[in-house]
Amino acid sequence: MTLNFWRMCTANLLLFASVYMLFPVLSFVMPEQLGMSVSRTGDMFLAFIAAMFAAGPFHAYLCDEYKRKNVLLSSAFVMLAAMAGYAFADSYLKLMLLASVQGVCFGLATTAGITVAIDITTSTRRSAGNLVYAWSARLGMLAGACAGFLLYDLYGFRTVVYAAVAVGVLGMYFASRVYVAFRAPIGLRLCSLDRFLLPRAWVPALNMLLIAFVPGVLLPLLY
């Protein structure tokens, strides 16, 4: 594993930590901030998921037409700007718009990050590299959620937002330090499901969805 690869793993960990610092906290802060029911605030997460998947068919084109690292950094920057907006959201519409923008950019940033990680890993080490890279995301989720709860208890919601943005900026710094060799565009279509929805991946994807569903439902309720 090269230094560039470890920089990408660190950037991935920080990116996921940044997003998951806010996720558990938003579920009970937004109802108070906006004066609406918890179930209605949950629409934000549905908007995030829908937007994240909506960006998928365009990922292959963007990473072919533009530099992969630039797609990652640009998406992460807009995502962090949307996350900062949660501190100032004062209506249901603004909440949904912020969640949608965050979802699109998070989807593009994570998929571009995976592409960069694969590009900088030798073919003989890609299986091990993919495993390490995936674990960096999992650790980022856990660390981010724990840090979010702790900061909220000690300092309040806005501190969590600012800390999440700061962590994301640090992740962008590590990603910007990665060297990615130039690859000539191959002329992919603007919208394509070829590298997004693979028929043989549906069963593992469903398995991961069901496993992640349990802690996703329980964590906000337990708090």
Q: Where are the regions a protein language model picked out?
A:
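C-terminal membrane-cytosol helix-exit motif in multi-pass small-molecule transporters
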Residues: 165-184
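Conserved MFS/SLC helix-loop-helix module at the cytosolic interface between two early adjacent transmembrane helices
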Residues: 54-87
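Helix-loop boundary and gating motifs at the non-cytosolic
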Residues: 2-42, 203, 216-223
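Helix-breaking motifs and short loop linkers at transmembrane-helix boundaries and internal kinks
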Residues: 35, 67, 88-93
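Residue-level signature of mid-helix packing/kink "hotspots" within the transmembrane helices
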Residues: 49-57, 141-142
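Paired small-residue
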Residues: 82, 93-101
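Cytoplasmic helix-loop-helix junction between adjacent transmembrane helices
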Residues: 100-137
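Juxtamembrane intracellular "pre-TM" segments in multi-pass secondary transporters
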Residues: 1, 179-208
